Amino acid sequence: MNISRIAAFLIPFLLGSACSASAASVKASRAAEPKRPNIILFLVDDMGWQDTSLPFWREEDGTPKPTFLNKRYRTPNMEALGKQGMVFTNAYAQPICSPSRCSLMSGMNSARHRVTNWTLLRDQTTDAGHQALKAPADWSVNGIQPAGTRASGTTHLPLTEEKIQYRMEKPFPQVLGLPALLKKQGYTTIHCGKAHFGSKNTPGANPRLFGFDYNIAGTEIGGPADYRGSRKYGTGNFHVCGLDENNYYENDTFLTEALTQEALKRLDAIRKNPREADKPFYLYMSHYAIHAPSTCAVMTRGLRKSTPTPMTVTNGPTTKNAIPP
């Protein structure tokens, strides 16, 4: 047999065998790796430590001690989470929304990231004017910004991804966010709901620039103008965008329910996507509730009639927010 013909046959055969063996080796090594967990992080701001039926106060021996306010609420899902997992009774958040969110995203407290109040418009403070009390000159009115952000340049708006020019006159901290770190580890990252990391028309207003692959309804706003779908979730600066194409307006879907449905749709799409199905996911689930305004969901109206104690649903413990009879 012609030696050149043998070589011509053997070389592609050996190359193919080597590639198959290499692919099998990679597949085997991946199979041997410990399976990374999916992560769903729920964040609720403006919620007091007693605004749930799960008690956080403990006796000296560690026994849970329900308070009067704990007895006003029925939150069975939180009770289930408390029984199945760990309850931290000495962990504290910031007393206002933006600083807490910026801390969770960055791993820094407000003394380091310099965000000490809620944010909205670029370079504009939300502090009330006072003759004696002055805000620190270097606190970040623009919130946190993604790593690599410059004082001026071009950025993408959240949701529409339209490009705009921006310029920040005030100081701002740069952050390599948690989703960016998880993305580097092979996670598919999803943001759903309230973002409120950076001021309007800054890079920090766009969750995708912090490392999220997908962004559902997250912008610079901290609270919705309205929770009702029939009101199109409000208008003006506090309108919740990105939910107007799924019959939520027509069906008067409560905002909390709409966001939950959108998150489930995204998880289902990931499961069906061959490029993402085998990857772990990180879902940052941040409903706008219980932030103002106080609105009762249609599905919960009338519950007060069948409960022995006063009960509130969307915001705060005051009686004016209770479910109407």
Which functions belong to the PLM regions below?
Residues 26-86, 195:
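Active-site-proximal N-terminal segment of extracellular/periplasmic enzymes that hydrolyze or transfer
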Residues 120-188, 195-296:
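Formylglycine-dependent
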Residues 63-71, 163-171, 315-325:
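A short acidic, glycine-rich active-site loop
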Residues 59-101, 107-112, 188-190, 213-219:
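Short, structured active-site-proximal loop/turn typified by the sulfatase FGly-forming signature C/S-X-P-X-R
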Residues 1-9:
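Bacterial N-terminal signal peptides that target proteins for export
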Residues 58-63, 101-110, 201-217, 221, ...:
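Aromatic- and acidic-residue-enriched segments that line the glycan-binding/catalytic groove
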Residues 8-18:
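Bacterial N-terminal signal peptides
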Residues 51, 258-271, 309-325:
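A long, amphipathic alpha-helix that forms part
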